[in-house]
């Protein structure tokens, strides 16, 4: 569907339209060429033209879709997180410190975790593991003896013993008791090894959370100890002489806290539990406030599911101030504050760039009239003329537009009935459909801008909208858009100095009707259509999916056997250039076949046998067989996505 001409448009208009000046700060802006620029170090300077960068990466045989990871942004996020807590600690005269950890589950990619460990050493920044495999990752990469290694998740004897033995490697693991039956395993493992880990307990808070992850707290939460279970755990540790090793209280109220009031309530409850644990004789020392530090996906700065009604500094201030208010009146030393802020750290540093392969839309063009058109087709032509000639007040026009659309639908049904009975040919049916959509387009163009619109008429814009076919798999690269209706910023990375004249949604490569993007960042509310530009046959149309660095890669799947995309790690160089630190090649067709236990060699051999049989039957020449097998071998080495 066309929305407007392209005159009188500026990059400021595009920034406002796509919310770039809200969610993009301080890393993404629009430059004078109408391209998105990336400032990986934020306000400290240095920028890269994203379109030029993609062009140069494609010149290095890194095809689209392409995942671009800016390691400078990862480091900058760490710096901002620690700076916020340092300011809060100074403002509230907090005598403790902040010591964060990165939850490995957010992004287990080796280069990502390595980068965080290296950048985080100056703050003794640690890692959080939620499984045995993640524990092994953390043990191999985390070499700072002062950094915390928080051990969460379900734990068997092997998990616990591995964590205990890690202390002898100079690590500082904290085994967090999340289920009552883990207490006895820790006691037995400690006796067997003659050593104990630092121990933590996770409390189930009664404070209610909101949003998509509200069930993370409360009596029915998946993890954590109820208050009676917490007291029983303390007594069991005391009986086993392990109470001196109880050092940490942990809670978690959701992956994306959208309302700061929820955090304040939880902090007050957890702060009092911490005080009571010290009164019961536990030395304590650490309070882990879990994850939940959200990011503003849609830039609205509200308590919506895709936003937050607080800033990073607000978050740090409330954590520091509330914990101090709980501890100081009770003469309890304030703890070292720990957070597992994976989403806030990792989301910004990674973006996916993909190209558009083509588009389609319903035809609203007006067919030429013929002398022997059926009555239903003539009725549709008359209805279109009526719509085009409407005048009067907005209220009166709206009533007449609804009446006209009702007429158009009736005439379309009459035409379909005539076709089914054999009274109408295919050309006349095509004319009836085109005229129906021409009526819809004329109505959509005339709907009042500032007036409540009947739902049926409001839906016409979506029905008329086009579909842009994107070279990606939603299930692989942005699974949360399908699974939980997560909003991500989706923006063309070029032509932003031109008015977008098309409304469309995005369909991916999979043979699945769910494989589409049809919820986009709007002005306060999600919108179903995205403003896009006309496609140019001579130049690729590039779109970016932003803020996708947390969870998306690891949760992506092999639906339709679309594999991982190419990925590249970029760092700014002095003088405004960049360097490529790592290239991670995406899956080939052979890779995904092997993942499903199809041996590419066996596959080729079967096809070779089939080709020989075709030669013997005279269906295939020898040179054609060779060309076919060469083509198949080449396909196995190629990416699972479409190429130029």
UniProtKB/Swiss-Prot annotation:
Keyword line: Decarboxylase, Lyase, Magnesium, Metal-binding, Polyamine biosynthesis, Pyridoxal phosphate, Spermidine biosynthesis
Reactions accelerated catalytically: L-arginine + H(+) = agmatine + CO2
Domain of life: Bacteria
Modification type N6-(pyridoxal phosphate)lysine: residues: 105
Pfam families attached to this UniProt entry: Arg_decarb_HB, Arg_decarbox_C, Orn_Arg_deC_N
Cross-referenced SUPFAM superfamilies: Alanine racemase C-terminal domain-like (SSF50621), PLP-binding barrel (SSF51419)
Named cofactor requirement(s): Mg(2+); pyridoxal 5'-phosphate
Residues involved in substrate binding: 287-297
Gene Ontology molecular function, alphabetical: arginine decarboxylase activity; metal ion binding
Record InterPro entries: Ala_racemase/Decarboxylase_C (IPR009006), Arg_decarb_HB (IPR040634), Arg_decarbox_C (IPR041128), Arg_decrbxlase (IPR002985), De-COase2_CS (IPR022657), De-COase2_N (IPR022644), De-COase2_pyr-phos_BS (IPR022653), Orn/DAP/Arg_de-COase (IPR000183)
Family named by the database record: Belongs to the Orn/Lys/Arg decarboxylase class-II family. SpeA subfamily.
Cross-referenced PANTHER family: ARGININE DECARBOXYLASE, BIOSYNTHETIC ARGININE DECARBOXYLASE
Protein's name in the database: Biosynthetic arginine decarboxylase
Annotated gene: speA
């Amino acid at each position: 569907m066309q929305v407007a001409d392209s005159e009188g448009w500026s990059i400021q208009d595009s920034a406002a339209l796509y919310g770039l000046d809200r969610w993009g700060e301080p890393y993404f802006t629009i430059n004078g060429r109408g391209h998105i620029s990336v400032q990986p170090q934020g306000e400290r300077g240095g920028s890269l033209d994203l379109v030029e960068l993609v062009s140069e990466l494609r010149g290095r045989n890194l095809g689209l879709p392409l995942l671009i990871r800016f390691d400078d942004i990862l480091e900058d996020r760490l710096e901002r997180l620690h700076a916020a807590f340092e300011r809060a600690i100074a403002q509230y005269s907090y005598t403790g410190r902040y010591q964060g950890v990165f939850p490995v589950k957010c992004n287990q990619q080796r280069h990502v975790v390595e980068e965080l460990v290296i950048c985080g050493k100056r703050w003794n920044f640690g890692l959080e593991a939620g499984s045995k495999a993640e524990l092994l990752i953390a043990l191999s990469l985390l070499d700072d003896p002062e950094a915390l290694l928080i051990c969460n998740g379900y734990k068997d004897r092997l998990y616990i013993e591995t964590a205990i033995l890690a202390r002898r490697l100079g690590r500082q693991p904290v085994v967090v008791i999340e289920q009552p039956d883990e207490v006895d395993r820790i006691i037995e493992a400690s006796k067997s090894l003659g050593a104990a880990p630092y121990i933590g307990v996770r409390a189930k808070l009664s404070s209610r959370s909101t949003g998509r992850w509200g069930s993370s707290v409360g009596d029915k939460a998946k993890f954590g100890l109820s208050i009676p279970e917490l007291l029983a755990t303390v007594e069991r540790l005391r009986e086993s002489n392990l109470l001196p090793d109880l050092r940490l209280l942990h809670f978690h109220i959701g992956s994306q806290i959208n309302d700061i009031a929820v955090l304040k309530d939880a902090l007050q409850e957890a702060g009092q539990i911490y005080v009571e644990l010290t009164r019961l004789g536990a030395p304590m020392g650490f309070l882990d406030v879990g994850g939940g530090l959200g990011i503003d996906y849609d830039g609205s700065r509200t308590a919506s599911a895709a936003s937050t009604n607080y800033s990073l500094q607000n978050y740090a201030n409330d954590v520091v101030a509330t914990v101090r208010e709980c501890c100081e009146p009770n003469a309890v030393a304030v703890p070292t504050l720990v957070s597992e802020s994976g989403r806030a750290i990792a989301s910004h540093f990674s973006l996916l760039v993909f190209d558009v392969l083509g588009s389609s839309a319903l035809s609203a063009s007006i067919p030429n009239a013929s002398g022997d058109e059926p009555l239903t087709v003539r009725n549709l032509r008359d209805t279109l003329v009526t719509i085009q000639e409407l005048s009067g007040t907005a209220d009166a026009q709206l009533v007449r537009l609804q009446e006209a659309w009702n007429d158009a639908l009736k005439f379309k049904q009459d035409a379909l009935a005539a076709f089914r009975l054999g009274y109408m040919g295919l050309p006349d049916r095509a004319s009836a459909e085109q005229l129906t959509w021409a009526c819809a387009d004329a109505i959509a163009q005339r709907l009042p801008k500032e007036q409540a619109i009947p739902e049926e008429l409001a839906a016409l814009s979506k029905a008329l909208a086009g579909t842009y076919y994107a070279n990606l798999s939603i299930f692989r690269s942005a699974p949360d858009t399908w699974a939980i209706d997560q909003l991500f910023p989706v923006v063309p990375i070029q032509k932003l100095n031109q008015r977008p004249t098309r409304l469309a949604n995005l369909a991916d490569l999979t043979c699945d009707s769910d494989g589409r993007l049809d919820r986009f960042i709007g002005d306060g509310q999600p919108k179903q259509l995205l403003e896009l530009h006309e496609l140019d046959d001579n130049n690729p149309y590039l779109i970016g999916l932003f803020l996708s660095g947390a969870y998306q890669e690891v949760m992506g799947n092999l639906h339709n056997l679309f594999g991982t995309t190419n990925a590249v790690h970029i760092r700014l160089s002095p003088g405004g250039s960049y360097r490529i630190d790592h290239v991670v090649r995406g899956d080939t067709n052979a890779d995904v076949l092997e993942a499903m236990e199809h041996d590419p060699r066996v596959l080729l051999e079967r096809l070779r046998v089939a080709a020989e049989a075709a030669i013997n039957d005279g269906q295939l020449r020898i040179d054609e067989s060779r060309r076919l097998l060469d083509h198949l071998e080449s396909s196995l080495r190629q990416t699972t996505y479409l190429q130029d």
